[in-house]
Amino acid sequence: MSHKTFSLVFAAVTLSFIAYVAIIQEHSAYAVVVFPDFNFGAAGDWGCTPNATSTVKNMVEKGIELNLGLGDYSYKPSADCWLDIIKPIFNKTKISIGNGDGAAWPEYMNIFNLTRQYYSFDVQNVHFLAMSTQLQNESDKLDQLNFVRNDLNKTSSNPAKDWIVVYFHRQAYTSLLEGGEDRTDIIMRDTYHPLFDKYNVDIVLQAHNHNYQRSYPLNYNEVDPKNPIRVSNETNNYYSDLSGPIFVTVGTGGNGLYKFGVKNDYLVYQTYSSYGFLNVDVINNGTKLSAKFLSNNGTVADQFTIVKSH
């Protein structure tokens, strides 16, 4: 099916399925903004497979309102087969580009109305930043760095934005694969993690390894970058007012899963046993993120909560 049959009605800043409701109390000098609950999902490494179809079905049944694509979609020269699979959630999808998208990346850019491989948008009090791990030209890499720095600086100083979610394809942090392969993207780790710390990023979503991994809240370790600093050692999966982002790998969209080697100490949980997606509910008037990895087999494989008191 040609992508021309699709109609993209997704606005970068204002989403049709989300509304701000302002309640202005009579005789009051203050306006109280009430944020309706909303949710978003994320997955990467899809492929045109029955497993990918099951992931979309899982997302539809959950009723996701936004789908963050973490790269590697059709694994083919054309995007068409993946577009067929995600048709039920196409108008809710915002992508980042992966290495497996290869020669088809200009097609993805055109389909999703992108002028560059990095961009940002807002939904209520949540700021989303999509980045590229596939830029080859040094000038393009510098442009992205400047964009990210300026974007995060602006957002972190905006009192209307309580949450920052960053997403891209290759991982800043990951366990070794079975056999010892290290798929860490050093640029994402050493160049960008310090910025994520500085500007109070809450969650970093990534893929590339075809499995699921979740870290503790982490700060960058200048002395030993391979071993980030655990900001919190909480084991009850409930975090309040974080001072470092949680890195989540969701390479479980549908392409063949990868086994792990040894789990790194900075990871809370990892699994390669099921396909699925990360669902995040933004609730309690935008003050709480409740995240669950929803396996396509109907189980909740992992869950965690982040709350903010301000």
PLM feature spans:
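Secretory targeting signatures
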Residues: 1-31
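N-terminal active-site segment of His-dependent metallophosphoesterases
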Residues: 26-81, 174-175
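A general structural motif
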Residues: 37, 64, 159-163, 288
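Hydrophobic beta-strand anchors of alpha/beta hydrolase catalytic cores
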Residues: 40, 67, 128, 164-165
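Active-site metal-binding loops of divalent metal-dependent hydrolases
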Residues: 43-46, 71-73, 99-100, 133-134, ...
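Conserved beta-strand->loop/alpha-helix structural units within folded catalytic cores of enzymes
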Residues: 67-73, 167-170, 195-209, 282
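Extended active-site neighborhood of metal-dependent phosphoesterases/phosphodiesterases
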Residues: 78-164, 178-192, 197, 203, ...
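A short C-terminal boundary segment appended to hydrolase-like catalytic domains
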Residues: 256-310
